[in-house]
C-alpha cells in the first residue's frame, strides 16, 4: 500500500518482530520500579533507555503522509498544556532535585517518546490515525501505573493523548519529546 499508513512489507515475521519489540518495551517500562533504590539504578535505567530508544528509532514504521502544523508551534501548545495542567493538578510526586534525577527523567522522556510516539504510534497507524493516537496514549498511561498507581491514570492518559496529538499534528516525535522533557522537569522542580 502506498497511502503512508501501512508498513510496506508482506513479511509477517517482520510484523511479529515489531509487535514483540512493542510488548518487550512496555514490559521494560513496567519493570522500572523494581530497579529503584540500588547503587546501579541510574546506570541500568540509562542503558535501558538508550537501548530502547535506539531500537525505537531504527525500527521500520509507517510514515505520515503529511503534517499540518510546524513542530515548534505544536511543541509550544504542549508547553502551554503542561503549565495549565501543573497549575490545575496540585502537588507532584516528591522526587529529589538532583542533576542526576533531572537528567535521567529527561532521557526517560525522550526514550518514551521514541517508543510510544514513533514506534508504537507508527505501528498502529495501519489501523488508522485514531487507533494510533488512542492506542499509544493508553499504552503510555498503563506503563506508568507501577510507578504512580492507578490514581494517576487520568493524568497519564491525558498526557499521552496530548503527546499523541502532537505526533499527529507535527508529523514526528520531536514535538512530543520536547513537551515530555519539559513536563518531567516541571514535575521534578515544582
Where are these regions (language model features)?
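Short hydrophobic alpha-helical membrane-embedded segments
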Residues: 15-25, 74-78, 129-137, 152-157
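N-terminal, membrane-interfacial amphipathic/helix-forming hydrophobic leader that caps
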Residues: 1-71, 80, 188-189
Amino acid at each position: 500500500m502506498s497511502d503512508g499508513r501501512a508498513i510496506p512489507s508482506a513479511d509477517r515475521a517482520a510484523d511479529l518482530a515489531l509487535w514483540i519489540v512493542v510488548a518487550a518495551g512496555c514490559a521494560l517500562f513496567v519493570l522500572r520500579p523494581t530497579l529503584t533504590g540500588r547503587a546501579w539504578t541510574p546506570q541500568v535505567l540509562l542503558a535501558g533507555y538508550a537501548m530502547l530508544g535506539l531500537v525505537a528509532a531504527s525500527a521500520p514504521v509507517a510514515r505520515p503522509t503529511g503534517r499540518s502544523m510546524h513542530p515548534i508551534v505544536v511543541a509550544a501548545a504542549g508547553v502551554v498544556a503542561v503549565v495549565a495542567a501543573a497549575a490545575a493538578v496540585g502537588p507532584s510526586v516528591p522526587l529529589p532535585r538532583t542533576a542526576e534525577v533531572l537528567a535521567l527523567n529527561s532521557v526517560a522522556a525522550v526514550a518514551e517518546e521514541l517508543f510510544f510516539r514513533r514506534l508504537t504510534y507508527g505501528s498502529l497507524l495501519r489501523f488508522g490515525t485514531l487507533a494510533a493516537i488512542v492506542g499509544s496514549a493508553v499504552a503510555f498511561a498503563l506503563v506508568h501505573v507501577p510507578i504512580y498507581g492507578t490514581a494517576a491514570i487520568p493524568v497519564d492518559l491525558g498526557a499521552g493523548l496530548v503527546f499523541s496529538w502532537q505526533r499527529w499534528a507535527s508529523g514526528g516525535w520531536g514535538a512530543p519529546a520536547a513537551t515530555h522533557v519539559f513536563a518531567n522537569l516541571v514535575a521534578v522542580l515544582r
